[in-house]
Amino acid sequence: MQEDLIIQKNLFAIGNDNNKQKEKTKIPEDLSLEDLKKESQKRPRQRKNSTNLINKFKTDLISNKKNVCINEESYSYKTVSKLKLTPVMKHYVTLKEENKDRLLLYRLGDFFECFFEDAVLISNLLEITLTSKDAGKEIGKIPMAGVPHHAMDRYCADLIKKNYSVVICDQLEKSSGNYGTPIKRGITRIITPGTVIEEGMLIAKKNNWITAIYLSEENSNESYEWGISKADVSTGELITLEGQSLSKLFDEIIKLDSSEIIVGSNAVRNLLIKGNSQITYTVSQETNFGINEANYLIKNYFQIANLEGIGLKNLKNATRSLGGLLNYLEKINPSNLDKDSSVKISLDFPQIQYGHNKLIIDYQTQKNLEIKNTQRENNYVGSLLWSIDRTYTCMGARCLRRWIDSPLLNVNEIYKRQNIITNFFESKKLRTDTQNLLRAMGDLERLAGRACAGHASPRDLIAIAEGLKKLPRLKSIIELFKYDLPNWTDQLINIDEGLLELADTISFKLVENPPLSISEGGMIHDGVDNILDGLRNLMDDYSEWLNKEELKERKISKISNLKIQFHKNFGYYISINKSKVNLAPQHWIKRQTLTNEERYITSEIKNKENKIFQIKSRASSKEYEIFCELRNIVAEKTKQIRSIAKSIASLDALLGLSITSIENNFIKPLLIPINDSMTKNSTKIIAGRNPIVEQLLSDKKFVANDISFEDNQKLIILTGPNASGKSCFIRQLGLIQILAQIGSFVPANNAEIKIADRIFTRIGAVDDQSSGQSTFMVEMSETASILNQATSNSLVLLDEIGRGTSTFDGLSIAWSVSEYLAKKIQCNTIFATHYHELNYLKNSNKNIQNFQVLVEQNDDQLIFSHRIVRGGSNKSYGIEAAKLAGVPKEVIEKAKSVLNSLEENNKLNHNIK
């Protein structure tokens, strides 16, 4: 209300002494709309152009300041003359020139400031005030915006989330107190979206990938060779792969889900943007992707004699991409900024990702099956991952996400995962004991990474120690497991004694609840260091002296409630109530007057204060030194900690899958290996259910359905009305296939599942405006990709083909595609369609079988049973579905009339050969 009143006063001069003058220009109330139109034509108003922040800054500066030099060069570090700048601004511009594509935060006193274009940008991004700073007599005012130094991490997190990289220039020494003496400043951190390790800048249950892409210089789209290397510097994971053709590269890039993608030139970036304009690429022209440089960097980083030992001997493009990634990380690594620093980015040996050892799920299939996010809203809730994730640690959640991205092909490895789920499934005590151990466990992968990078806090180290102390109890649980177990369980049974000793060392040196700040002391236990203990003894002596001094001054002044207190700005002082001022002795020196309090100092207190500060400073420095030594010890164990953390993560993921199985009545499937010549069995699922839809149906029971590809009947033609459940059914098979191949139990009463080498989906289609492709062309491109890449071991899920063209063209294409899949490729396929003519394919091809969604019609009312039964449907019930959707009755009646006419005059010949 107060704000409204102020606005009214300003606009209408309410309560203003000038009201009498305003009355002279009072607007007549009887003006008609025509009068106002004539007035506007008589004196037309000119449109005012909107101004950007820089122009607004100039306008405000000119209107509010006199004698200010306004030049275009004042607003850009690129055009400003360094010779005209103050020493501080000259240093800022020099650093900015070296970091053109990053925001530079420059420490000045208690603030980190930005200038020139960066100031305008961050004032907009962070919604902070844009102000100005004097850059020298000849330059005048320049734009400035800043954030408090204590809140810098929070603001950096906001910038990182908006995909900006940040350079931190901090003060490297304390102010000498001499005005005019420059303070030494330098770059202490470079933070990019792909290299953050701070907890507040990361998504706990998701990897934070930074990716480097090498692209060969070829002309043909299909002859382009490429290499990709991606790393999560917070967990140490490193994956590399290579391939051929731009189409495959574009698909891999979309699947990467990277926070930052590095390429070596604008030409490469421009080429990749054609594949997907929604992805941002960082062009690092100084990054070297040369093969010789890559060989040197990789061998030097991993301390190996050759590349053969890590599987890169014959993978030149993968090697180039990994070399480029390491080259980029080296340039932004803090250890390169400070040669004496012991910190580094620690990465594991690269995992070589081959197409032949994992189930391939391309981006389109991930999207269609809603594996990690829903298709329409891109939400986590409603995805496959949401439906099965019952993990207790962030490590386990990330592990499960990786498994879903790359399910296994090796049946023996899958069975070993199943065995752990079975152990948990059969024993509530094993589940409960493991849950209790994992529930409060910290993120050991990322905690170790922060220690290695020199950013771990005392609380981080305590969390590492607490996690490592649980290893013996985890060992006792694993030893109770039956059946054949994965190799990674060996680490949990044969525990590295060095890790247990490390946990004891951390607990011995650090207090249980250390402070957040590492510069103010209070984090190291007594008895850890003789020098620190000696300093603390002296501190105790001075504390005792202060207590005695307080009693002495009370006695002298006869003020019983007198206190000696401490303030960070004033130091130690005597505090008395204002009513006792008349009792203050003459040797007291007045320091500060407050509303109800007077503060004094004495020469004795001041003398002791200096000594107390010196001892406190030495003690804090000693604690910091001890802590840094301890952090370095932890950093040396980073690889061992991360290795055991990955085993814990796998255990957590399987524990979560066991809980999902119990909650949702999943069963253990029997798996049929690829190319199993001993059996002709194929996928057979009894009472299968869609794991996502079933959990979303809170008040309804999901209708389970069977499916079988036995007796070489590889292709199922599925017909039925719209909204009857066809799409749900074909997605259900894809989801069950993925669950089975990550080692999970599946939603069914019984299941035999043949291992698939790849899942293809063609479900729905929209036009692709970025590439200029129509809906039909997108549909045909996806179909062509399936026909050209599917093998007899693939799983193909089709939901309509040929809808975007004429009926005869569409039917012809659908017919031909079906025959090609059944006769030539012979892979397990479900084809949901409204072309009922395709049911006749069964008559001429023994590999094809017909199924339909059962529906009942009561007068004009459709009743969906969602039951899948053998046999083909001969009616789509499209008009009935339109009626259910609320289409006007007049339109429905007309549609019925047209349909009857078409059926009479355009009967199709079903004897197509």
Curated annotation (Swiss-Prot):
GO terms for cellular component: cytosol. Keywords: ATP-binding, DNA damage, DNA repair, DNA-binding, Nucleotide-binding. Residues 19-42 have a biased composition (Basic and acidic residues). Pfam families: MutS_I, MutS_II, MutS_III, MutS_IV, MutS_V. PANTHER family: DNA MISMATCH REPAIR PROTEIN MSH1, MITOCHONDRIAL, DNA MISMATCH REPAIR PROTEIN MUTS FAMILY MEMBER. This protein is involved in the repair of mismatches in DNA. It is possible that it carries out the mismatch recognition step. This protein has a weak ATPase activity. This is DNA mismatch repair protein MutS. The lineage of its organism: Bacteria, Bacillati, Cyanobacteriota, Cyanophyceae, Synechococcales.
